[in-house]
Amino acid sequence: MTATTAPRLKTRYREEIAGKLREEFSYENVMQVPGLVKIVVNMGVGDAARDSKLIDGAVKDLTTITGQKPAVTKARKSIAQFKLREGQPIGCHVTLRGDRMWEFLDRTLSLALPRIRDFRGLSPKQFDGRGNYTFGLTEQVMFHEIDQDKIDRVRGMDITVVTTATNDDEGRALLRHLGFPFKEN
């Protein structure tokens, strides 16, 4: 039987980052220190309204990237201008928690983001007011798991990092300590 090891980023958070954040914001209680709750990876496939086979490629890509089978998002109501019917698949999303979340975040920060051409850093203004951060990626090729020769088309995705931070400053400090490459104004 092999012993399971904690993800690298999770260990760093517990040993170094939590202590730094506690000093920085002078928390009384250890439970006040912000941490990660979940990461939601969403891939909208608007063209799936016209061609239903496109959703299969998105599901396959997301499964390969995250290691978890995505849930297919369906249209809530019909919209004639978009040629959209209620119940039609229009995207897929994955919610990552626990060790899978830490592993995915580590891979994204250390491998995927540096592979983006002309990458200048993530915008520090994309927080939602409650310490959660959302950023978009324009193509799925930046992940090593995706074989460039086998993709049927380029798909972007939204990645939302949900934290226990109460405001944007705490969330920004947490993500900066975790290694998010924010742009300096």
Swiss-Prot record:
A Pfam family: Ribosomal_L5
The keyword Zinc-finger is assigned to this record: no
Family: Belongs to the universal ribosomal protein uL5 family.
Gene Ontology CC terms: ribonucleoprotein complex; ribosome
InterPro entries: Ribosomal_uL5 (IPR002132), Ribosomal_uL5_bac-type (IPR020930), Ribosomal_uL5_C (IPR031309), Ribosomal_uL5_CS (IPR020929), Ribosomal_uL5_dom_sf (IPR022803), Ribosomal_uL5_N (IPR031310)
Quaternary assembly: Part of the 50S ribosomal subunit; part of the 5S rRNA/L5/L18/L25 subcomplex. Contacts the 5S rRNA and the P site tRNA. Forms a bridge to the 30S subunit in the 70S ribosome.
NCBIfam families noted in UniProt: PRK00010.1 (NF000585)
Gene Ontology annotations of biological process type: translation
PANTHER family the UniProt entry points to: 60S RIBOSOMAL PROTEIN L11-RELATED (PTHR11994)
Highest taxon in the source lineage: Bacteria
Function: This is one of the proteins that bind and probably mediate the attachment of the 5S RNA into the large ribosomal subunit, where it forms part of the central protuberance. In the 70S ribosome it contacts protein S13 of the 30S subunit (bridge B1b), connecting the 2 subunits; this bridge is implicated in subunit movement. Contacts the P site tRNA; the 5S rRNA and some of its associated proteins might help stabilize positioning of ribosome-bound tRNAs.
SUPFAM superfamilies on file: RL5-like (SSF55282)
Protein name as it appears in the record: Large ribosomal subunit protein uL5
Organism in which the protein naturally occurs: Streptomyces griseus subsp. griseus (strain JCM 4626 / CBS 651.72 / NBRC 13350 / KCC S-0626 / ISP 5235)
One annotated GO molecular function: tRNA binding
Key words of the record: Ribonucleoprotein, Ribosomal protein, RNA-binding, rRNA-binding, tRNA-binding
Keyword tRNA-binding in annotation: yes
